[in-house]
Amino acid sequence: MNLITLENFLDNSSFLILLLTMLIYWAGAAFPGMSILPTLGTAGVAIANLSIATLLGSRWLEGGYFPLSNLYESLFFLAWGVTAVHLIAEKMSRSTLVGVVTTPVAMGITAFAALSLPADMQTSAPLVPALKSNWLMMHVSVMMLSYATLMVGAVLAIAFLIVTRGQDVELRGSSVGTGSYRNKLGRIQLSQAEKTPDGSVVAMADGNGSVGTAVLDRVDPQTLVTDLPNLSPQRLNLADTLDNISYRIIGLGFPLLTIGIIAGAVWANEAWGSYWSWDPKETWALITWLVFAAYLHARITRGWQGRKPAILAASGFIVVWVCYLGVNLLGKGLHSYGWFF
């Protein structure tokens, strides 16, 4: 089996594995009693990650350079990054909902690369002179890892909004599963909690397979309301987990994005004599940086938690895709891949 045949097998296999894994995670969410499904899902993501890594390694051997020279290779590197960050996020959160929302992203990326791109864009070709630099690996790989990390963090924020049904629930805990839960007006729902003799409220929840206790602030009985959309203790526990993990993952992706932009500026100065030329890709990279900088600023200095930062992070998901793919497919600028829908 030659390298080209191996690559064709691996790209289609990666797509099929991720498709099956996505269905397994969805089935696990629909039937939580089937404890084998989360294990199968995690194994599927790990196998897909290994398959994509083997594909990229094969491309490296075939072309003799780090496989990030065209859209096909960068898409699979992005999918590899998403699956790698997924495994980290799932281990941190111990929640199968991570796979429910991340596997569709990884599967969609591999489907686009393997099934939609023209054949001539999937073949390995010699590097153009401008890309024959050690900065190719430093700049592009770090940027792609930052995109993957920020996408996972953003999609977890979207999952938070879905779990909370868009309610302005304030999560005031710094550790996973131990926060206090309040809506915007500082009220909680009677159906969510059990009042203790001292006036505090205890909510028992089994959000991720184990029973935990969240102790809420002491409240006046007059503030207990039942007219708000019902959110169970399980949903609140899960929302707290998603909010916390999304914050941590974005906190990891933002420094990677910063390093990638700086490395790109240094490379641009070496290649073209200018650190910044307001190329469309550079402009959108700056916009992406500003969006997630605003998110982290709101979380760290303003103390935002819950719906408002989640909306900001969710908008960042779209911005990352525009920066990575939308600008490239316009066929303009130094970062264009020259292919149109």
From Swiss-Prot:
Sample GO molecular function, one term: heme binding
Function: Required during biogenesis of c-type cytochromes (cytochrome c6 and cytochrome f) at the step of heme attachment.
Species annotation: Rippkaea orientalis (strain PCC 8801 / RF-1) (Cyanothece sp. (strain PCC 8801))
InterPro entries reported in the protein's UniProt record: Cyt_c_assembly (IPR002541), Cyt_c_biogenesis_CcsA (IPR017562), Cyt_c_biogenesis_CcsA/CcmC (IPR045062)
Keywords: Cytochrome c-type biogenesis, Membrane, Thylakoid, Transmembrane, Transmembrane helix
Designated gene of the protein: ccsA
Pfam family, one: Cytochrom_C_asm
Identification of the protein by name: Cytochrome c biogenesis protein CcsA
Segments traversing the membrane: 16-36, 37-57, 68-88, 97-117, 142-162, 249-269, 276-296, 310-330
